[in-house]
Amino acid sequence: MIKIERQTKETDIVVELNVDGKGKSDIDTGIGFFDHMLESFAKHARFDVKVVCKGDIHVDFHHSVEDVGIVLGQAFYQSVFPVHNKERFGDAVIVMDESAVECAIDLSNRPFLVYEVDIDGTIGQFDAELIEEFFRAFVFNARITAHIIQKRGKNRHHLAEASFKALAVALRRALAEDKRAGMPSTKGVL
């Protein structure tokens, strides 16, 4: 279990992460829809995740969403690197009713995000553009490469949830044990 705390003038965050968990979550960011996405992420990655965030949500949700991504990404990095005896690559296509989102990842230690999901507007009170902000913060702090691409769909909630689940399942698959892999790079280091 990795525990990271981060305090700024905008947020006060505590994250606990066990990547070898069972998908249990205890999420409290004060942002209902975001909590739902993080719970779904934990469940489908099979990570045990605890997140407590006290943020300036009276201003808007941006600082809380981005900062949770930063801290969760840092916890993931500390949990996984250096990568050894793992598949390293993972992918998933997740459908939710009319929506389908694909995610492919590489535990590369080279952060890069391709995000091509067309979600404009709001989901309840949640600004949908914050989904990309979360993924960018997570990916860059986890030091992974992720491509999250919409295959079809138009319902904002479905696209968002399929995106979080696709990342979760791709991560679970990339973390699958492969004792033959050793250091899964021809460079000898990731």
Swiss-Prot record:
Keywords: Amino-acid biosynthesis, Cytoplasm, Histidine biosynthesis, Lyase. It catalyses: D-erythro-1-(imidazol-4-yl)glycerol 3-phosphate = 3-(imidazol-4-yl)-2-oxopropyl phosphate + H2O. InterPro entries: IGPD_sf, ImidazoleglycerolP_deHydtase, ImidazoleglycerP_deHydtase_CS, Ribosomal_Su5_D2-typ_SF. One of its GO terms (cellular component) is cytoplasm. It is found in: Cytoplasm. One of its GO terms (molecular function) is imidazoleglycerol-phosphate dehydratase activity. Pfam families: IGPD. The keyword ATP-binding does not apply. GO terms for biological process: L-histidine biosynthetic process. Pathway: Amino-acid biosynthesis; L-histidine biosynthesis; L-histidine from 5-phospho-alpha-D-ribose 1-diphosphate: step 6/9. Its EC number is 4.2.1.19. It comes from the Bacteria. Belongs to the imidazoleglycerol-phosphate dehydratase family. PANTHER family: IMIDAZOLEGLYCEROL-PHOSPHATE DEHYDRATASE (PTHR23133:SF2), IMIDAZOLEGLYCEROL-PHOSPHATE DEHYDRATASE HIS7 (PTHR23133). This is Imidazoleglycerol-phosphate dehydratase. It comes from Nitratiruptor sp. (strain SB155-2). The gene is hisB.
